[in-house]
From Swiss-Prot:
Gene: lplA
Keywords, alphabetical: ATP-binding, Cytoplasm, Ligase, Nucleotide-binding
Compartments, record wording: Cytoplasm
Residues covered by the BPL/LPL catalytic domain: 29-216
Any one GO MF annotation of this record: lipoate-protein ligase activity
PROSITE patterns hit by this protein: BPL_LPL_CATALYTIC (PS51733)
Descriptive protein name: Lipoate-protein ligase A
InterPro entries according to UniProt: aa-tRNA-synth_II/BPL/LPL (IPR045864), BPL_LPL_catalytic (IPR004143), Lipoate_ligase_A (IPR023741), Lipoate_protein_ligase_C (IPR019491), LipoylTrfase_LipoateP_Ligase (IPR004562)
GO BP terms in the entry: protein modification process
The organism of origin for this protein: Shigella boydii serotype 18 (strain CDC 3083-94 / BS512)
Residues that hold ATP according to the record: 71, 76-79, 134
Family: Belongs to the LplA family.
Length: 338
């Protein structure tokens, strides 16, 4: 029986692909070496310990239907579109060695005619007239008996959108969590015009087989049917949930302030696991009672625009004369936390 396994995903769904990756990683025999090739449509992928509100322009992502996906490895935030090729190498210990998987990717690039080299802890760079440019970033995860190395290759990514979604709004977030390091990047199409995802996958596959001296048939993972993988439905449900992608953010505080025609308002939220643990309201409004009531209602509320709006509008029953103020407040808060 071969010790190699090759999987290729036809899905562009980041939650689907990360769930497949997690399933394979959990159930693979310790003697197996796995290569999984995939790509995602418009997605910001954040590291396990990151705060999406700090790392991303979550409002613009929502407007443009860009998904958020939290991965199980560490590292920083990256934007994926179909101009990226994603790879995952998995192996049991002691065979797991990220220098081997890095060399396989470098060999694949070399076979395509690109001379790249490893830089720092997790990047691959090429030399250009403007200096070194990053074409690949990686992240890693290890457990007691196995590990994986996954990363992306920039083929023809829309680099203008990197700045759109990875530069967060200037929110007043006093947040813990790992801050992404921005790097100067370039696409492989600058060096190899017309290079395709299929060509890159083929080159990585050949380099993978060459390193281990054996070949296997590819297993195609299709979004059209549920993969025959242990606990896939459960893992996909978690991977696609708000509780995992947003709610796992490290604790942080968010300070909002705005001046309305009826008075100034300052809101201070403390947020843990995606829930507001403390809400304070300060105002010079002549009628502060609705705002004081709102602070009480927001305690324990999910830090999500629709939930905050719901709590604001629930106050209309008790404060019908302040409908205009409460609706203005509701719209403002929802916009500020998106």
């Amino acid at each position: 029986m071969s010790t190699l396994r090759l999987l290729i995903s036809d899905s562009y769904d980041p939650w689907f692909n990360l769930a497949v990756e997690e399933c394979i990683f959990r159930q693979m025999p310790a003697t197996q070496r796995v290569l999984f090739l995939w790509r995602n449509a418009d997605t910001v992928v954040i590291g396990r310990a990151q705060n999406p509100w700090k790392e991303c322009n979550t409002r613009r992502m929502e407007e443009d239907n860009v998904r958020l996906a939290r991965r199980s490895s560490g590292g920083g935030a990256v934007f994926h579109d179909l101009g990226n090729t994603c790879f995952t190498f998995m192996a049991g210990k002691p065979e797991y060695d990220k220098t081997i998987s890095t060399s396989i990717v470098l060999n694949a690039l070399n076979a395509l005619g690109v001379s790249a080299e490893a830089s720092g802890r997790n990047d691959l760079v090429v030399k250009t007239a403007e200096g070194d440019r990053k074409v690949s970033g990686s992240a890693y995860r290890e457990t007691k008996d196995r590990g994986f190395h996954h990363g992306t290759l920039l083929l023809n990514a829309d680099l203008s959108r990197l700045a759109n979604y990875l530069n967060p709004d200037k929110k007043k977030l006093a947040a813990k969590g790992i801050t992404s390091v921005r790097s100067r990047v370039t696409n492989l199409t600058e060096l190899l015009p017309g290079i395709t995802h299929e060509q890159v996958c083929e080159a990585i596959t050949k380099a993978f087989f060459a390193h281990y001296g054996e070949r296997v048939e590819a297993e195609i993972i299709s979004p059209d049917k549920t993969p025959d993988l242990p606990n896939f439905a459960e893992i996909f449900a978690r991977q696609s949930s708000w509780e995992w992608n947003f709610g796992q953010a490290p604790a942080f505080s968010h300070l909002l302030d705005e001046r309305f025609s009826w008075g100034g308002v300052e809101l201070h939220f403390d947020v843990e696991k995606g829930h507001i643990t403390r809400a304070q309201v300060f105002t010079d409004s002549l009628n502060p009672a609705p705002l004081e009531a709102l602070a009480g209602r927001l305690q324990g509320c999910l830090y999500r625009a629709d939930m905050l709006q719901q709590e604001c509008e629930a106050l209309l029953v008790d404060f019908p004369d302040q409908e205009k103020e409460l609706r203005e407040l509701s719209t403002w808060i929802a916009g500020a936390v998106r």
